[in-house]
């Protein structure tokens, strides 16, 4: 027992050290950006430096009412601007900052997740079902999650009471910091300043935090519990196989919808219509699934971080996975922003408004041509 406690204490100290290193790196990247970057990106110059006639030249989808109405030249503009804005917005450094706050929010989020799940399931069931997360995390990093799950469950049976509710609310509030970091990053991508007040901003971020916990519980139930229930029904082998395979595309659709909701409602701006955020959401979903698989394969076969970093190896691998995931999410948002930036038509929800009065930088300006 003492050995296990010592091992868990060592991992906690290692993770704290990793957080400190990442925080310093993010601060340095923010204070000392690459001086080779342009002083002003295409967004800043598209309306002030380019004549309106040039900006609205035909054949580029300037009057498209959906992404499908944008021709090839327009998509070339979109891809070039997306590439430029990844540098202009210092996407990699911003993602590193999000990871720092995400790591601080990780343990409270796990606590909220496990505490909620433990209300309806025993300790063994919770451990078995939570283990499905190991299929998405890089090799060796799931042990960090496992240790925190064991720590929460070691407190005994969860019962709905004042103490439990207070602890759960505290955990959700702590995890809320990570969500606010994502919202801040999405504001950067959309060239927006936070205009919502303290209470409105926290209400939005808390809604996304609670929604994330509920979505994870739903995913666990869908991926783990549904096959168990189906096995009790006694379906034919072919039907059972089809359902077991089909749960993964269904999970991808859930992720796509979650990203679309995040892209639409998280930034401080008038929300875009669904059609303008669908492509970025789909690209981010597919890229994340492929990227997670490739990263897991690399870490399992080539990336032996425990040799280089010792006890920090698992934490470093987890950080890299979180960084990759954040970059993918922000890339999807960047792509959506530039798709919306291509048209002069109103891309926001509600009644159409003239350009300049739509309450969103990407809808109120027109992107540069290449």
Language-model features: locations:
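Membrane-embedded alpha-helices and immediately adjacent juxtamembrane helical segments
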Residues: 2-370
